[in-house]
């Protein structure tokens, strides 16, 4: 039985209008002072654990009472979590600290469906919560013999530099397909049954400049990294992702690479070190370097796109440019989003009334929301590229997170989970037991209507292309059947292409996606450039070397398009970027001749390819 702690925060709530105070988060010029008083609900004589699994905090914000519900983030650390630093003489020191009884929580505000919270309860309460669509921060004031805390808004923190900050990735994403509904981009029923989430094992590296910035206080650095990881973990849940911290390395006796303001150089150097050094010592899926170096220009983060699970490129670099944890954690999640195949948002992407996390310019208001575009691109990457490293289930030495009834996550042993009894809005689910109510066949799923299985034949997943037929309910389950595609190699689009993994890839669509309307497949003569084997014209890469196309394979290298748009007359237009050399290549499965498709940079017979 989880013991519940009730803490009443008595407010001597007086905003200091016009006055300021220096906190860990910076110079704050408008805040409320609160004095937490812990009132335990444990039975008399019971032993109180150091950090409870679940807690409630009652307090007031702007004179209004609120109740903050918190649950320990038991998936924050992997069971084999390790920490490495270096002695003054350069010796590597690795430890495996006990992290089960940690003090990092996620939560929500009672009766506020849009609320979220990420709190450290290690030494007082530190973190942030969202209440009535506004983000508030709470932090101990650290006055002698006082339990005083400050509550304040981000807008009241003085900024050292008001100049706009940006991600260094310069690519934009365009789509020739209509926006897909989130319900159509789901993991198969079999995958959902055993593993509804994807699990990213995150490794954080802290450079020497960060150590200097923190006066060599390794404990302070560790606490900050835990807080950042706790927030990143919370943010990624919007994508049905779970980031567990598997390791932390602090370059306390000098950097292992040369960290420069040049983000291209630093990202590539870190990626190479990760591949040749870190991966040989510690299994992980993704690594991020946090540095106090000031990157060139307004850039504060940089990453490879669509590289999750790659032995070298599943990395990102982030500048620790703000003392506010939420701000830096948002950048970390943004860059990991790039690794997960997400590009920057464009004008047609939406997060409702909130700024989006994947905007190219960092918003003045920290946002934890991914747009509809981000969701689509992430799961499109996962379903098409199938990165294997994030499929491992949270068992054994992986994430330790037992089911918790009432957290609105469907976990092992639960038939449904609609939140707490006071917040549950699912008429099929008993919130107290996380079991279906009597007479209910289901409580969720694309084939569940009014607590009953949908009739057999009801469409539950629309056709997304000629090669992807619609799926229909069976009448025996609440889940939509697994997404089934037509056989690879089946002709499609009036024989202009062949089916490949549910799509019908043709060069016209790929040109449209890269350059927009009035752009078409170029003449055959343009593709001869792919025989050069130079930085852009090649068919494939082997051990880092670009292999020129054989004459019969030229249509399976770089894509060339004819641009007839107003003001343009480019018969051999192509796309190339140092950030993502693969973008602009002809996609696998594309028709390259009658009866032939592209496969690994070769134009081969359909029967051979499939």
Curated annotation (Swiss-Prot):
Binding site for Ca(2+) 1: 201, 285, 389, 392
Cofactor(s) listed: Zn(2+)
One example of a Gene Ontology biological process annotation: proteolysis
UniProt subunit comment: Monomer.
InterPro entries: ADAM_Cys-rich, Disintegrin_CS, Disintegrin_dom, Disintegrin_dom_sf, MetalloPept_cat_dom_sf, Peptidase_M12B, Peptidase_M12B_N, Reprolysin_adamalysin
Motif (D/ECD-tripeptide): 466-468
Binding positions (Ca(2+) 2): 404, 407, 409, 411, 414, 417
Organism, as annotated: Bothrops insularis
Keyword tags: Calcium, Disulfide bond, Glycoprotein, Hemostasis impairing toxin, Hydrolase, Metal-binding, Metalloprotease, Protease, Secreted, Signal, Toxin, Zinc
Active site: 335
Cellular localisation: Secreted
Pro-peptide positions on chain: 21-189
Superkingdom of origin: Eukaryota
Gene Ontology molecular function: any one: toxin activity
Residues annotated as domain Disintegrin: 402-488
Cofactor details (free text): Binds 1 zinc ion per subunit.
Keyword Protease: yes
Glycosylated sites: 372
Domain spans labelled Peptidase M12B: 198-394
Any one GO CC term of the record: plasma membrane
EC numbers, comma separated: 3.4.24.-
Name this polypeptide is given: Zinc metalloproteinase-disintegrin-like BITM06A
Disulfides per UniProt: 309-389, 349-373, 351-356, 405-434, 416-429, 418-424, 428-451, 442-448, 447-473, 460-480, 467-499, 492-504, 511-561, 526-572, 539-549, 556-598, 592-603
């Amino acid at each position: 039985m989880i013991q519940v702690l009730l803490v009443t925060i008595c407010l001597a709530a007086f905003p200091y209008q016009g006055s300021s105070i220096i906190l860990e988060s910076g110079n704050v010029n408008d805040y409320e002072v609160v004095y937490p008083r812990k009132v335990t609900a444990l039975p008399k004589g019971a032993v109180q654990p150091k950090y409870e699994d679940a807690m409630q905090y009652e307090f007031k914000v702007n004179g209004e009472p609120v109740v903050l519900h918190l649950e320990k983030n038991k998936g924050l650390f992997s069971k084999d979590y390790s920490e490495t630093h270096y002695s003054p003489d350069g010796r590597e020191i690795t430890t495996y600290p006990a992290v089960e009884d940690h003090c990092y929580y996620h939560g929500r505000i009672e009766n506020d469906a849009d609320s979220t919270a990420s709190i450290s309860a290690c030494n007082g309460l530190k973190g942030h919560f969202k209440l009535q669509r506004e983000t508030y921060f709470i932090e101990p004031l650290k006055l002698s013999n006082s339990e005083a805390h400050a509550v304040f808004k981000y807008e009241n923190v003085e900024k050292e530099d008001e100049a706009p900050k940006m991600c260094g990735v310069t690519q934009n994403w365009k789509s020739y397909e209509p926006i897909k509904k989130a319900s159509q981009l789901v993991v198969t029923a079999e995958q959902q049954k055993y593993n509804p989430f994807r699990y990213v094992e995150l490794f954080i590296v802290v450079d020497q400049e960060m150590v200097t910035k923190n006066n060599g206080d390794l404990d302070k650095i560790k606490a900050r990294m835990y807080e950042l990881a706790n927030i990143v973990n919370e943010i990624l849940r919007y994508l049905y992702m779970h980031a567990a911290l598997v390791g932390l390395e602090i370059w306390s006796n000098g950097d292992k690479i040369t960290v420069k303001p040049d983000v291209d150089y630093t990202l590539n150097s870190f990626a190479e070190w990760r591949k040749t050094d870190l991966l040989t010592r510690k299994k992980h899926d993704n690594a991020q370097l946090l540095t106090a170096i000031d990157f060139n220009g307004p850039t504060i983060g940089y990453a490879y796109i669509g590289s999750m699970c790659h032995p070298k490129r599943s990395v990102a670099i982030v500048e620790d440019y703000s003392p506010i944890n939420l701000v830096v954690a948002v950048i970390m999640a943004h860059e990991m989003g790039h690794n997960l195949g997400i590009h920057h948002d464009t004008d047609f992407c939406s997060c409702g009334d909130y700024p989006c996390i994947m905007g190219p310019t960092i918003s003045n208001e920290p946002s934890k929301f991914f747009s509809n575009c981000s969701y689509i691109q992430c799961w499109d990457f996962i379903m098409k590229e199938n990165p294997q490293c994030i499929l491992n289930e949270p068992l054994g030495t992986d994430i330790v997170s037992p089911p918790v009834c009432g957290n609105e996550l469907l976990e092992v042993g639960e038939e449904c989970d609609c939140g707490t009894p006071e917040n549950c809005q699912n008429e099929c689910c008993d919130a107290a037991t996380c079991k279906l109510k009597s007479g209910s066949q289901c409580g969720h799923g694309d084939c569940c209507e009014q607590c009953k299985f949908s009739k057999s034949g009801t469409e539950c997943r629309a056709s997304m292309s000629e090669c992807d037929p619609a799926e229909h309910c069976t009448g025996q389950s609440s889940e939509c059947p697994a997404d089934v595609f037509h056989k690879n190699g089946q002709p499609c689009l009036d024989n202009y292409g062949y089916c490949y993994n549910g799509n019908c890839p043709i060069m016209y669509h790929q040109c449209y996606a890269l350059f927009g309307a009035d752009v078409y497949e170029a003449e055959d003569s343009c593709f001869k450039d792919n025989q050069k084997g130079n930085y852009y014209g090649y068919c494939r890469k082997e051990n880092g070397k670009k292999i020129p196309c054989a004459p019969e394979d030229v249509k399976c290298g770089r894509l060339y398009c004819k641009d007839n748009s107003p003001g343009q007359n480019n018969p051999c237009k192509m796309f190339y970027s140092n950030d993502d050399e693969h973008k602009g290549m002809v996609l696998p499965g594309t028709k390259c001749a009658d009866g032939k498709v592209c496969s690994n940079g070769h134009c081969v017979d359909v029967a051979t390819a499939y």
